Amino acid sequence: CARPHAAPAEVGADPASLAQAAGRLHAQQPERFALAVAALRQRVPGLAAVEAETGRDGRCTLRFRDAHDEEAFDVQQLAEGTRRLFAWLLLLHEVPPHSLLALETPECRLHPDLLPELADLLRAASLQGTQVLIATHAPALLNALTLDEILCLRRDASGVSVTCAGASEDLRALYEAGEAPGRLWAQGLFEAL
């Protein structure tokens, strides 16, 4: 599971990728692995523990313990949304400061109530110097951001343009009047950027 510390590899929510990422963080930075597990336990009611073990073949096995059942269960038995959340938490705890963290549709399969928390976690990573780039189609995730945190990328024949949603006086006026960014986006008002 261990490899020399470098920029984090791609982390997926599939069981093998998740076990590999967890094992890498557990072996290289056990204190950060513990923080990722604590963050997962905080967001998944009833989750008592997560254990990572490296076998003789070098592969990691993840075992989860429910607070209401003494029997540990395997990562394959974990709900897909919980696996995705754990993948994001592992990545956020592994990525070194001043890195680029690119996430495509991080909202997929996550409980909608977790989207504001995900936004807060990504914001915290950004404040620590990590550049965070998200591609999303989730108004609920956009609602957890400020207009100044939202960049709109447009591609046309001449290239790619980047515009901050907060630079639009019209959007800012609506936002300051109480409209949520996700609702503005869903209404097509970002198209003018």
Positions of PLM-derived features:
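C-terminal lobe/lid and adjacent interdomain/linker elements of RecA-like ASCE P-loop ATPase modules
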Residues: P116-L193
